[in-house]
């Protein structure tokens, strides 16, 4: 993990229907780290993540990815930015009528001119990287929840981006399966130098893999730092209360 700032969020504000969700949020993500957007239900963590990838409009501010602003990007600039990251949506969001291999090949079909044989080969390679190559021809319904999440990570990696955004990757998984997914994320970060930005409230997972985190509250950042340090040495009463309350939810997940 280096000190290079691969993502810079500057004074980002987001709102809907007259209600401000995020106000003047600023932080940076360093190359190769696993960065956690942490917060309770309704804190805006998924909104922040989706805004960073250009799905939601912003009221103001910037999201710089390798120095280029995602907010308001259009045309060739937007296309170039979109190729720099992959996304795993909450629940995995695989197409149920497609096999795992076909799901992974879809971005290759839409975004490259590779022949079918090359797309098939690459999709199976990505499945191999997440431990699912033997299940390439299975439908999502024929696999487990943990396998669906792994396949969704593989699809996010299809175009070899340097950054992966994951929205609640451990949601709905039992503790053992969640720990296995954590091990995969850590291995991908270590072996391929991928930078991860993860929205999560699952503290067991956050402690296991998070290099740094921000804790959202009231539309802003209540704290920033290493997850274990925030837990053990909370900078304010809200952070202390959050980490006392949330572990019970994490163990019950």
PLM segments and residue spans:
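Helix-to-loop junction immediately C-terminal to a conserved catalytic motif
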Residues: 53
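Conserved ABC ATPase "signature" region
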Residues: 69, 116-135
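Conserved ABC ATPase signature
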Residues: 139-143, 147
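Conserved catalytic motifs of ABC-family nucleotide-binding domains
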Residues: 160
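Catalytic Walker B motif of ABC-type/P-loop ATPase nucleotide-binding domains
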Residues: 164-167
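A short, surface-exposed alpha-helical micro-motif characterized by mixed small hydrophobic
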Residues: 206-208
């Amino acid at each position: 993990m280096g000190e290079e700032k691969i993502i810079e969020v500057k004074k980002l504000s987001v709102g809907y229907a007259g209600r401000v969700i995020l106000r003047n949020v600023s932080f940076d993500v360093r190359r190769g780290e696993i960065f956690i957007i942490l917060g309770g239900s309704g804190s805006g963590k998924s909104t922040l993540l989706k805004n960073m990838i250009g799905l939601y409009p912003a009221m103001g501010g910037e999201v710089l990815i390798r120095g280029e602003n995602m907010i308001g990007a259009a045309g060739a600039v937007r296309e170039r930015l979109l190729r720099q990251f992959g996304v795993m949506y909450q629940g995995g969001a695989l197409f149920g009528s497609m096999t795992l291999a076909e799901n992974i090949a879809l971005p290759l079909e839409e975004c490259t001119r590779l022949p079918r044989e090359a797309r098939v080969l690459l999709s199976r390679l990505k499945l191999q990287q997440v431990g699912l190559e033997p299940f390439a021809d299975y439908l999502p319904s024929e696999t487990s929840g943990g396998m669906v999440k792994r396949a969704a990570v593989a699809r996010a990696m299809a175009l070899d981006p340097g950054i992966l955004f994951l929205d609640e990757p451990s949601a709905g998984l039992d503790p053992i399966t969640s720990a296995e997914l954590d091990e995969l994320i850590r291995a991908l970060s270590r072996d391929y130098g991928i930078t991860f930005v993860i929205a999560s409230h699952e503290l067991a997972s956050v402690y296991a893999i998070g290099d740094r985190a921000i804790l959202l509250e009231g539309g802003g950042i209540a704290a920033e730092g290493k997850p274990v340090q925030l837990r053990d040495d909370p900078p304010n009463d809200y952070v202390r209360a959050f980490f006392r309350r949330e572990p019970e939810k994490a163990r019950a997940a």
